[in-house]
A protein has these predicted regions:
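A short, surface-exposed interaction/processing loop segment used at functional sites
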Residues: 78-128, 145-228
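Short, non-transmembrane alpha-helical segments in secretory-pathway proteins
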Residues: 1-55, 96-120
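A composition-driven signal for long, intrinsically disordered, charge-rich low-complexity tracts
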Residues: 1, 67, 223-225
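Exposed beta-strand-loop-beta-strand "reactive/processing" segments of non-cytosolic proteins
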Residues: 29-86, 130-143
Length: 230
């Protein structure tokens, strides 16, 4: 069974106070349609460096924001984002295909047999460097605590990586075995591009310096003698 997180009161107040200012005609309106609001999701962001080095996910992922999912009709969606800062900010609404995918995926993940076999706390894991978002199902032990990270599940629902299957539940070990090499390859590519960019900058600086030296040399050169009248 999947449990939705408890939203901190300050996050909820930020959502309630700012939501109306961002709505457009036709958007689902929370006060008028409470059924349109789905449980909120806490989003964690995972960087490429810790992922590539197989650092423990629970130690490396950083709390980024909260999402409040809403749906007016099947296939269309809307979600609001509130940051997880000490002073939370309402950063806006997502509409269209990305929102529809997020809303539908939230419904689908709850129906997965693997998710129903144990108790989990639901959150979202965003890996911007891999253009991937996944549900992070944190296993809950008999004591009611998230006590064994090895039993967590990762379920990608948006990804640009063909090696990852959307809506397939991976153990953390399985997911890391696939994603870590991808992150390492991306980092190497970023480093190569950075080195190439720095090389071009140095070439441009050297060319500019040569021009400056040429102008200085020209400025210091003595004037040629003037022709004497006959």
């Amino acid at each position: 069974m999947i449990n939705s997180p408890t939203v901190p009161p300050v996050i909820r107040r930020t959502f309630d106070r700012n939501m109306g200012a961002f709505l457009r005609p036709g958007d689902p309106t929370p006060p008028d349609n409470q059924r349109a609001i789905r449980p909120a999701q806490q989003v964690f962001s995972l960087g490429m460096e810790p992922l590539s080095q197989n650092h423990p996910m629970r130690d490396s992922a950083v709390a980024a924001n909260w999402r409040f999912l809403m749906a007016a009709t099947a296939g269309s969606g809307l979600y609001a984002t509130v940051t997880s800062h000490d002073a939370p900010e309402f950063t806006g609404l997502a509409r269209g295909a990305p929102a529809a995918i997020a809303v539908q995926a939230d419904q689908d993940v709850r129906k997965l047999p693997a998710a129903q076999a144990e108790n989990y706390n639901l959150s979202v894991l965003a890996i911007p460097g891999l253009l991937t978002e996944a549900f992070w199902l944190k296993w809950i032990g008999p004591d009611g605590k998230e006590s064994d990270p090895a039993r967590d599940l990762i379920v990608p629902f948006v990804t640009a990586q063909k090696q990852l299957m959307p809506m397939h539940p991976y153990t953390v070990e399985e997911f890391t075995r696939i994603a870590a090499p991808l992150a390492k390859k991306k980092l190497q590519s970023f480093k190569r591009l950075e080195e190439e960019s720095q090389g071009r900058v140095k070439q441009q600086q050297a060319a500019a310096q040569e021009k400056r030296n040429a102008w200085r040399a020209l400025a210091r050169a003595p004037e040629p003698p003037r022709a004497q009248p006959v």
